[in-house]
């Protein structure tokens, strides 16, 4: 799977985050929540008339371990091992993690990170 990073950790500061990206099957998007953001809301939407399946994962490894492409470290599915979602989903995660990533398994999705 290929991941695109939507925002670097050091560039957001106290202004918060609000970014989104369209993601297609076999790709993903990830973020390192800024230190001063208390929580991040992840909203995943499947475009009207389309289908899509995806996972949402978090990691607590050091940013250096995660790397620039989010393929390092250990990642945990927030809904449990092997759980794949296939409907619009919104979840809030406290900023006690170093990385959040969304994997598009099939179809197409829109992913937004706000905090």
Predicted features along the sequence, with ranges:
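Surface-exposed loop/edge segments in extracytoplasmic proteins
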Residues: 15-19, 63-78
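Structural beta-strand segments of beta-rich domains
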Residues: 38-42
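Beta-sandwich interaction modules
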Residues: 22, 26-37, 73-115
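Compositionally biased regions
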Residues: 3, 56-59, 99, 107
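Short, surface-exposed beta-strand/strand-loop-strand elements in extracellular ectodomains
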Residues: 49-70, 111-115
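Short, intrinsically disordered N-terminal pre-domain segments
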Residues: 1-18, 108-115
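Generic low-complexity segments that are intrinsically disordered, proline-rich and/or Lys/Arg-biased
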Residues: 9, 34-35, 48, 64
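Solvent-exposed strand-to-loop "edge" motifs in beta-rich extracellular domains
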Residues: 45-49, 105
């Amino acid at each position: 799977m290929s991941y695109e990073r939507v925002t670097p950790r050091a560039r957001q500061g106290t202004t918060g985050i609000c970014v989104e990206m369209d993601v297609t099957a076999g790709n993903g998007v990830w973020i390192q929540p800024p230190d001063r953001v208390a929580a991040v809301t992840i909203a995943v939407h499947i475009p009207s008339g389309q289908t899509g399946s995806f996972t949402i994962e978090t990691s607590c490894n050091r940013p250096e371990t995660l790397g620039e492409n989010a393929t390092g470290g250990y990642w945990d599915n927030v809904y449990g091992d092997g759980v794949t979602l296939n409907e619009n989903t919104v979840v809030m995660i406290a900023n006690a993690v170093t990385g959040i990533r969304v994997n598009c398994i099939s179809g197409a999705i829109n992913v937004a990170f706000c905090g």
